[in-house]
Regions:
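Surface-exposed, charged secondary-structure patches
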Residues: 83-125
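A mature extracytoplasmic/lumenal domain signature
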Residues: 71, 114-118, 152
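Short, low-complexity N-terminal intrinsically disordered segments enriched in polar/charged residues
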Residues: 21-63, 162-168
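A short gly/proline-enriched turn/hairpin at secondary-structure junctions
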Residues: 60, 66-76, 87-92
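Hydrophobic pocket/interface hotspot
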Residues: 45, 57-58, 65, 77, ...
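Short beta-strand edge/turn micro-motifs at domain boundaries
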Residues: 132-162
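Beta-strand elements of well-folded, non-transmembrane domains
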Residues: 50, 118-122, 139, 156
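Bacterial N-terminal signal peptides that target proteins for export
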Residues: 2-16
Length: 168
């Protein structure tokens, strides 16, 4: 009956759909950027540990963080975390491999779940220690930076040696 009006409605609906899609792609892109940013944060932990940089490692945690490592009592607060790692870091040549399974950001909270493989060769004895499992790092945004609020790892039967890259 009104062909010209129908064309405008169709054109309007098409434009609205394009605008909605463009906003969706911006949101997906922003989420991907945050996930990449969080993946980089996860890599910092392994880098500082491998380099025996205790001070660098401590910069990654909030003051009231909790660390719960398999086979160890939970550590509450930065002082306990520092004390624990100070007796271990730098005592062995350590190499980590990480396989991120999930990275998500929700406002000022983010988390990473990853498979990990650790190979540590004692600097004095040459004895090799291997560990593999799954970890959960929960991050809080603090003063514009992502900081670890919870660091949990566990042994798990579906993550075992050798590491996928061939690290052995």
């Amino acid at each position: 009956m009104f062909p010209r009006l129908t064309r405008f409605r169709t054109l309007g609906a098409f434009c609205a759909a394009l605008m909605a899609l463009s906003m969706l792609s911006v949101a997906v892109s922003a989420q991907t950027d945050f996930e990449t940013e969080i993946a980089v944060e996860g890599g910092k932990w392994a880098k500082y540990y491998e380099q025996a940089d205790l001070e660098g490692l401590m910069t990654l945690y909030v003051d009231d963080a909790i660390v719960a490592l398999h086979g160890q009592p939970a550590l509450f607060g930065i002082a306990a975390i520092r004390e624990y790692f100070s007796t271990r870091i730098g005592k062995a040549e350590s190499v980590f491999e990480l396989d991120y399974e999930l990275r998500e950001t929700h406002g000022d909270i983010a988390y990473i779940i990853s498979k990990y493989w650790l190979k540590a060769t004692d600097n004095e004895t040459g004895v090799v220690y291997k560990d593999a499992g799954r970890s959960l790092l929960v991050y809080k945004k603090q003063d514009g930076q992502w900081k670890i609020a919870a660091d949990i790892d566990q042994a798990t039967p579906d993550v075992a040696w050798p590491a996928p890259s061939g690290l052995n």
